Amino acid sequence: MRTDEEEYWIQSIRAGTVIHKNITIVPATIDQVRDAANVYRLSYDKSLENGIMTDLGLENWMIENSLLPKSFFTSKENLNTSIDNIKKNLFNNRSNKAAVKSIRGDLKNTRAKLKDLFAPKSQMSHNTCEFIAQTEKLVSLLNATTFKNNKPYKPANMNIVIEIWQESLASESLIRFLARCDIWKSIWANKGFDFKLFKNKPDDDLTINQRNLITWSRVYENIQESMDCPTDNVIEDDDMLDGWFLIQQAKREKEKMEQEVEKLSGTTDKMSEANHVFIPQGSNIDISLLNEGKQSGEHIHDIVRQAEEAQ
């Protein structure tokens, strides 16, 4: 993306308004967002009363009628897990160009499988409580925030306005790119110094783009402060960085598990000499993580559940 395109996106997000010819969509106030949330709630309840299926209900109905495979839920979970594992593999092999190319192919294929799995559902999702309520919520917001020639604009058919609004939404990959670019980083660095990141009025809520840009700016800021901060090449690669996130999360969870074991068994010294660790029933310990420690040569040799003795 050219620098001028980066700046246009950033300044458009900062302005908060969506402008298309003589139509303008302004940021919603917090009161308007509250009212729209109430529209969603009432619409959802009304749909339930009218016998319309929820999103989960639609999935179950489609499975029962052979419109989705019986393995739908298992396949969905397995494919999402595979995507996470592939991203971790991508990070772990970041120095091997040939491996990275092959892994990216695996990731693309797995995402395609997940998309294909949901394809039949996407054709019917407009018949759910969630979709109907979300549409009515959006129409409510756009009715309150859309202007034509500086006058409130509430057309009988909102499809054109909805399309304009949807086209203004930045994808996650674009938001992440903008959060990393120098133009935005120089603006972000001035936050908190009596400097406005966005043009919004005091009672305006953040737009979706503004909220997402703040979220990712904070994420990248935290990454830079991390003791295990990855290289710029990793940070600039969304999938590879996701792999780093997942690995860091697993590391933190493993450390937490080990700390819980130490508390249950006494001091660290006693832990290092123990051949057996007794885990009380109901303790929040993931045995598989501890077994990983055993395989890597750490001092945890065996995990034995002894509920009666622990009580």
Language-model regions: role of each:
Residues A119-N157:
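Charged, long alpha-helical segments
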Residues V33, N109, K115-N127, P155, ...:
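Generic alpha-helix detector with strongest preference for long hydrophobic helices that associate
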Residues T29, P69, N96, M124-T128, ...:
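Helix N-terminus capping/helix-initiation residues
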Residues M1-I19, V33, K148-Q311:
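Charged interaction scaffolds used for protein-protein
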Residues F73, N78-L79, N96, L142-N143, ...:
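Poly-acidic low-complexity segments
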Residues K46-P120:
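Low-complexity, serine/threonine/proline-enriched polar segments
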Residues M1-S71:
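N-terminal leader/presequence-like segments
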Residues Y8, D35-L42, T81, A112, ...:
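Charged/polar, solvent-exposed surface patches and flexible loops
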